[in-house]
Amino acid sequence: MGAPARADLAATAHRVREHIVGMCGGPEGGHLGGSMSLVEILTVLYFDVMRIDPRRPAAADRDILVLGKGHGAICLYGVLAERGFFPVGELAEYARPGSRLMGHPVRAVPGVEMPTGSLGHGLALANGFALADRDRRCFAVLGDGELQEGSVWEAAMASAALGLGNLTAVIDRNRLQITGPTEDAIGLEPLADRWRSFGWSVREVDGHDFAALRGALAPGASGANGSAARRDGRPVAVIAHTVKGRGLPSVEAKTRSHYAKLSGRQADRSLAVLRARRRREEAP
């Protein structure tokens, strides 16, 4: 597909945020904050960067994305539905009996490559995909709290040792986890230097800025002349600085946004806030 205009990406992101709120108003609620922080990242990847075809979700030449932070599933579902992997109307079945849209991704959902949710395994899984076919790009989208799992760093060491220049890890750096700030749990800083010390090329961007994300994630940013792999064989880590709960001022950058089970009234109010923001941003 041709590169979408920023306005098209923004409109898609607004719809995805509305889908997230709708799913958090379902019977089981959902991980609101960490899904809202992911929206621009996944929107750019699925609509502007990855080589994918929703009509052929198992195509041999497709690019691969593994959502390491599987608790961000409702964002992934919203993006996949908007991209055409399954009907948008199916989002209303999220977490209901018999639905394939569960609280964490499963392979029964078109576009989902691996079941995730047990933190710390996404990068290792992406390593396997990248090693199996170096002619395609592979992405692991990781939470910053997830980086406190030792298995992430074992996988990071292997990525560089194996020369997986077709692999990109995107870190959702919203600085909050279920217990509070990441730096109060197990400090991650200096995060960029940590990745570099493991043999990775590192870029830091505003994770809500479409142009910045495009620049860091576009094929030419990883390989020469748009090829899948970097010539130097180094994997790329993109540290995307984000805001947990982005789009809803009442929960932005708040730990309590981690999980939400919204009442009908709360969901309606949240949707009204999102739609008002969308009108302001789209106004000439």
Question: What does each model-found stretch correspond to?
Answer:
Residues 1-16:
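N-terminal hydrophobic or amphipathic helices/low-complexity stretches enriched
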Residues 63-65, 136-140, 167, 232-242:
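Generic beta-sheet signal
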Residues 13-29, 172-174:
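N-terminal capping segment at the start of a domain
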Residues 23, 35-161:
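Cofactor-binding active-site loop characterized by glycine-rich and histidine/acidic residues
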Residues 77-79, 106, 151-153, 179-183, ...:
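Short acidic, glycine/serine/threonine-rich loops at helix termini
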Residues 210, 216-284:
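Glycine/aspartate-rich loop-and-adjacent alpha/beta segment that forms the canonical ThDP
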Residues 71-72, 174-175, 242-245:
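Glycine-rich beta-alpha junction loops
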